[in-house]
Structures are given as structure tokens and as C-alpha cells.
A protein has these predicted regions:
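Non-catalytic pre-domain segments flanking phosphatase-related domains
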Residues: 1-112, 125-128
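Core residues of folded domains in eukaryotic genome-function proteins
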Residues: 106-117, 139, 145-148, 175, ...
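Conserved protein kinase catalytic core
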Residues: 119-121, 226-227
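Eukaryotic intrinsically disordered and solvent-exposed regulatory patches
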Residues: 94-99, 103-106, 133-139, 150, ...
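Short interface patches used for recognition in eukaryotic signaling and trafficking proteins
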Residues: 93-101, 121-131, 144-150, 236-239
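C-terminal cap/substrate-recognition subdomain and adjoining C-terminal extension
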Residues: 161-288
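Conserved phosphate-coordination/catalytic loops
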Residues: 89, 130-134, 192-199
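Substrate-recognition element of Asp-dependent hydrolases with the DxDx(T/V) motif
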Residues: 136, 140-165
């Protein structure tokens, strides 16, 4: 564990914003939701409320357990919203191959969650009031300097924009490839306004052809959201803003991401060596 160091960039190149196929449409900055965002009253379906979300592949239980944000379960998304995804046979076949370490690191794509991962929103009546996870800003600065970063949250666009404004400077915001909110999940109008389980299908970010399971990692507090690509998901404990929570989670994520940058195929490495927290981890400066 090395703490935060200056990032090692292949060929010594510095960061330059890129127009990358499939990741070029940044979320508008204004607080209003996009015009095409679903609207309408919040409706609940009794049938969906009673349904249970099926469990994923057995290998997915290797990640650390997460806390529940609410006692009531999420509904299963409707067929119109894509339903519940499963890993494709092609995905699993590639992930099951042996990992290979590269001689030099490369800029991988980090798809970053917000609420529960980097921030905590304690009061829904004050949606623009957030508590930052320890080291959140330092961690994000490092990721932006060392990797390509996209932000994908299941929150509504206006709340996503407020979280990003709190977490990043305007200059850092320009470095983010794309910021996606709830309107980027392809949800039906009813599901958009309901407490439905959402799935971050990484194929959404892979449409341009530059990114794929070999060079992409989703950082999220929900393993279920990464169900379609379980070995491209780094799951960390949900942050609830409590002083009793482990303070040095993000420095350990930082170290794991550094190793992923050396991997020829991220999915193969994560399958074999999933992210695990060290409960007695201490930052080097704290140990001095």
C-alpha cells in the first residue's frame, strides 16, 4: 500500500481531454433535468413490489458485503427497461482466461458511482446536501490524473450535477469524459419514477469500440448494479456518513486500480483476485 503518489502515465504523456466514441455526450450543467427525461407521477406496482431480484453468478459473492439504504427492496425493472441482465457466454469465456500483466501501466477507464461510493446524502428533503467519504477529493484528483474517468449515478440528473459540483473543481469537471444520471439507464417512465433496481450495463460505454471488458472497471457500492459484467465491478462498502466507518477505503481502491492499470484484461484479473479491504490498513503517513 503506497498512499497517493503522482500517477505513472505511459510514455510520460499528460492528460488531454478526448472525444471518445460512446463517451462524448457530457451531462448538461444546469440543474434542470433534460427535456427527454421521463416525467409523471410516482406510481408503484404491487406485483413488482412483491417480486424478488434473482441472485447473480456465484462468483459475485466474493466482493465485500454492502449495507442496505432502505428496508424496502428495489423492484425488478420492467421488460421495457431491459429487465434483469445476465453475463453473456462470450463475456464469461473471456473472463475465464488467465490474467496477464503488462510491462507498463496504461490509462484504463474508471466508471465512478457517486452516492454511497464517494458521497452520502443524509436527507432526501435536502438533496443538495452531501457528506464526502474520507479522501474522496484526493482520490478523484488522482483518478483524473492517472486514468480516464466517467461518472454514472442512478440519481436524477439535477442531483448528479450538484454532487459533481461539490466533489470536483470546474477544471476537473472538464476532465471527466461523461456524466450520466438516471436518464441514462433506458428506463421506462414508470421505472424512472419508481424505486427500481437499475443495472449499469457497461456495454453502454463500450458502444464506440475503444472500451471493453479488458480495460474498464466500474467502482460502485452495489454489486448488483454490475450484474451484467461482474468481473468488471469493484465493489466497496456503502458509505453512510458515519464516523465509525472504515476511513481508509478509497486509498485501498487507489492501490487496486493501480494494479488494474497493469492488466492486459481487467475482467480476468478481477475474477481471479477480486478487491478485498484490509480492515487494519493504515496510510503510510499515519504509521510514521
Amino acid at each position: 500500500m503506497t498512499g497517493y503518489k503522482e500517477p505513472v502515465v505511459p510514455n510520460g504523456s499528460s492528460f488531454r481531454p478526448m472525444n471518445i466514441p460512446g463517451l462524448t455526450l457530457a451531462q448538461p450543467r444546469q440543474s434542470d433535468a433534460p427535456k427527454n427525461a421521463p416525467k409523471g407521477p410516482k406510481k408503484k406496482s404491487k406485483a413488482a413490489a412483491d417480486a424478488k431480484i434473482p441472485k447473480g453468478p456465484k462468483a459475485m459473492i466474493q466482493a465485500p458485503p454492502t449495507q442496505r439504504r432502505s428496508s424496502s427492496p428495489h423492484k425488478i425493472p420492467s421488460r421495457a427497461s431491459g429487465g434483469v441482465p445476465e453475463p453473456t457466454p462470450q463475456y464469461m469465456a473471456q473472463a475465464n482466461l488467465s490474467p496477464e500483466r503488462l510491462p507498463q501501466p496504461r490509462r484504463i477507464l474508471i466508471i465512478m458511482d457517486l452516492n454511497g461510493t464517494l458521497l452520502y446524502r443524509p436527507n432526501k428533503r435536502r438533496p443538495f446536501n452531501f457528506v464526502e467519504r474520507p479522501h474522496a477529493k484526493t482520490f478523484m484528483k488522482y483518478c483524473l490524473d492517472a486514468f480516464h474517468v466517467a461518472i454514472w449515478s442512478s440519481a436524477r440528473p439535477e442531483n448528479v450535477n450538484k454532487m459533481v459540483e461539490q466533489l470536483l473543481t470546474p477544471e476537473q469537471r472538464e476532465q471527466v469524459l461523461v456524466v450520466w444520471g438516471r436518464d441514462s439507464f433506458g428506463l421506462s417512465e414508470g421505472d424512472y419514477n419508481a424505486k427500481v433496481q437499475v443495472y449499469k450495463r457497461l456495454t453502454t460505454a463500450h458502444k464506440g469500440g475503444l472500451w471493453n471488458q479488458s480495460n474498464t472497471i466500474l467502482v460502485d457500492d452495489s454489486l448488483e448494479k454490475g450484474r451484467s459484467e461482474p468481473f468488471n465491478t469493484l465493489t466497496l462498502p456503502e458509505f453512510s456518513g458515519l464516523s465509525t466507518e472504515m476511513p481508509n477505503v478509497l486509498p485501498q481502491v487507489h492501490d487496486y486500480l493501480n494494479e488494474l492499470a497493469y492488466q492486459a484484461d481487467i475482467s480476468r484479473f478481477v475474477r481471479q483476485s477480486p478487491f478485498k479491504l484490509d480492515p487494519v490498513y493504515v496510510l503510510p503517513e499515519d504509521a510514521a
